[in-house]
């Protein structure tokens, strides 16, 4: 009976979103506010005008019907302060963006394109067992991973819907371009074929079509960027997130760390390290990335 109780909700979730969702005229909005909400996208959802908005204090996104009454956003809101911080120099080739919080630990898991079957289910099940629900986790996801791993995606989405996880759906671009052996300055989002704006918006549309609300958090593939790429991301209303604790690279978390592991089975070493730290009591609690503070 236990196995059946798991299988039926997953099947129901898949069937629920078998219905057609049509997204049209999906365009960035000039940054204006309606009350405490900043409007970052306008679009047509199944024939109805909608807006993707972000609460300028909580940093949570939501979809709502279009409102005509707008005004300039509060310059001193959390959202705009974080945008300004993320958009400011210097612009390193690697690991630009916000890399550290003031307190707690922030778990981010990257879902880059992968030919490997399944996903790091052991990681998500471990935090679901360990912490009070819903457990905050950020998934920096790509469209190519979603398309190749639909069942894994639905499992993650279900855990979010039933309250086991509190998923922040982060943007890792749709395509995640990568050319083995090529210099970083001409790789990932700096590849000649990259259209970063389109790559970002395509991923957002893919999430919306699957019943998921995109967040305002973005991670550069390979953590590689330049000044132009950073400006592109922030002008779309997104906040780049780096890391100071890429576990598979030997970095260890400390108070305020943004932890990076891969949930796509491409880097099992990082997952093994995280699970060991969890067992040793060195991951006492997790915080949502929306709790990050500006300097």
Q: Where do the model's predicted regions map?
A:
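Terminal accessory/targeting
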Residues: 1-108, 115-138, 144-151, 255-295
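Catalytic metal-binding/acid-base residues of hydrolase active sites
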Residues: 112, 174, 223, 264-265
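Metal-dependent polysaccharide deacetylase catalytic core of the NodB/CE4 family, i.e.
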Residues: 129-231, 235-259
């Amino acid at each position: 009976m236990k196995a059946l109780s798991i299988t039926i909700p997953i099947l129901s979730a898949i069937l629920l979103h078998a219905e057609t969702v049509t997204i049209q005229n999906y365009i960035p909005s000039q940054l204006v506010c309606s009350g405490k909400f900043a409007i970052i996208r306008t679009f047509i959802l199944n024939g109805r005008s909608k807006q993707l908005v972000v609460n300028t204090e909580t940093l949570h996104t939501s979809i709502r019907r279009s409102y005509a009454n707008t005004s300039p956003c509060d310059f001193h809101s959390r959202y705009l302060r974080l945008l300004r911080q993320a958009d400011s120099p210097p612009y390193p080739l690697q690991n630009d963006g916000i890399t550290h919080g003031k307190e707690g630990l922030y778990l981010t898991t990257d879902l880059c394109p992968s030919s490997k079957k399944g996903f790091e289910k052991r990681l998500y099940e471990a935090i679901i067992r360990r912490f009070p629900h819903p457990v905050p986790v950020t998934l920096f996801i790509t469209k190519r991973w979603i398309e190749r791993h639909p069942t894994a995606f639905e499992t993650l989405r279900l855990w979010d819907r039933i309250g086991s996880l509190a998923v922040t759906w982060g943007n890792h671009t749709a395509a995640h371009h990568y050319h083995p052996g090529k210099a970083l300055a001409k790789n990932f989002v700096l590849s000649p074929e990259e259209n970063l704006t389109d790559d970002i918006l395509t991923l957002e549309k893919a999430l919306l079509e699957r019943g998921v609300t995109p967040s305002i958090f973005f991670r550069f593939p390979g953590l590689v960027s330049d000044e132009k790429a950073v400006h592109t991301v922030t002008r779309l209303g997104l906040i780049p997130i780096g890391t100071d604790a890429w576990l598979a690279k030997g970095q260890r978390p400390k108070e305020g760390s943004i932890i990076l592991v891969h949930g796509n089975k491409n880097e099992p070493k990082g997952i093994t390290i995280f699970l060991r730290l969890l067992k040793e009591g060195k991951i006492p609690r997790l915080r949502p990335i929306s709790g990050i503070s500006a300097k």
